[in-house]
Amino acid sequence: MYYYVNKMKKIIPVILLVLSLAGCYNSSEPRERILKIYNWADYIGDSVLEDFQAYYKEQTGENIRIVYQTFDINEIMLTKIEKGHEDFDVVCPSEYIIERMLKKHLLLPIDTNFAHSPNYMQNVAPFIREQINKLSQPGEEASRYAVCYMWGTAGILYNRAYIPDSVATSWECLWNRKYAGKILMKDSYRDAYGTAIIYAHAKELEEGTVTVEELMNDYSPRAMELAEKYLKELKPNIAGWEADFGKEMMTKNKAWLNMTW
């Protein structure tokens, strides 16, 4: 039996946004008849993409082709976009990448005049709006460039056959030498750093003298050194750094703990 415990009490929105890239495109098709999407795997089913093309034809009388690509690491996605190899219309990164993209002027404002969804923007939860606008840059309100698609938390998935419930109540279980070679971590700088720095400040968090948000955004030399120290201590326990194969390893008992989304 597997069980999931929410650990990182931080909202991590996943956002849709429009890009201002002018990458190369070698095709005889008119570019305006192609919708290019860059997304995480498993976020949109193939049938939805097919249905959208039919819906678009029904609404406009025009055909559209969807070019759909996926990524599994935020930084790989950002690097590809920065190099200008693709002119994506829509991408779906995590929130901290949106902040970087705004700083580098990689985005275009979203046309919020949704003809068939007039109430969408007005009905976005105020909390989500607030989280998005925390990413704003001078003169650039983030909600002009990003619309929330999903949000979630990071936590621990564990196999009850090997891990007692009482053990999986703290990040400390990841550093337990009993589970050497049986722990999976996300192949994500942000999540690896966050896990280490939160664990390092467990006492301060419990006392309420610091918040998770403050820790996640602390990139001082002292914080970086501390995170590095704890990640090096964690290394013997790691079975792998994964983005999408964690569930398979867990079901085959090759890993017992998975720091996951």
Named regions from a protein language model:
Residues 88-93, 239-240, 256-261:
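Paired acidic/hydrophobic, glycine-rich loop segments that form the ligand-binding mouth/hinge
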Residues 43-46, 102-249, 254:
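Extracytoplasmic ligand-binding site segments that recognize negatively charged/polar headgroups
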Residues 24-104:
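Early extracytoplasmic/lumenal segment of secretory-pathway proteins
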Residues 1-34:
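Short, low-complexity disordered leader/linker segments with a strong preference
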Residues 72-73, 166, 260:
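Short, glycine/acidic-rich beta->alpha junctions
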Residues 40, 95, 188-189, 260-261:
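Short, well-ordered beta-to-alpha junction loops that form the rim of enzyme active sites
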Residues 15, 68, 164-165, 256:
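Short N-terminal micro-motifs specific to bacterial/archaeal maturation
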